[in-house]
């Protein structure tokens, strides 16, 4: 899944927001009951940072999720990968390009569900739509934060 969004802001302000794991809750739908559980979490992300949280993505079933910031170049990109959670694979690239009058933010998400054919069926029936809804919510929140002056 790939998503692009133009933000009418400078790279410093966009980066300050997206590189703080404490802002994840602000761009996650309330019904997901997102709670960061990492003790003493740093203000800003860094390569090797582990972020643990509880989230209820489907049927209000709470689950633990742990991601690691595996790669990062300030004002350019960062990558988070699931270390524990509902996916067999979760690799999320966040790319930032300075453009005239703003920043183009691109999300590239590669993921795979466990359980073979059952996982594929579950994806078709529930997961794909849920992920699209989450990223639509994030798009709208980022739009309100950076594009409505």
PLM ranges: what are they?
Residues 36-84, 137-140, 144-148:
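Glycine-rich portal/gate segments that line the openings of hydrophobic small-molecule binding cavities
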Residues 10-11, 70-77, 95-104:
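A short, structured loop/turn motif at beta-sheet edges
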Residues 82-133:
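Beta-strand/loop substructures that line and gate deep hydrophobic ligand-binding cavities in soluble
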Residues 1-46:
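Hydrophobic ligand-binding cavity/cleft-lining segments
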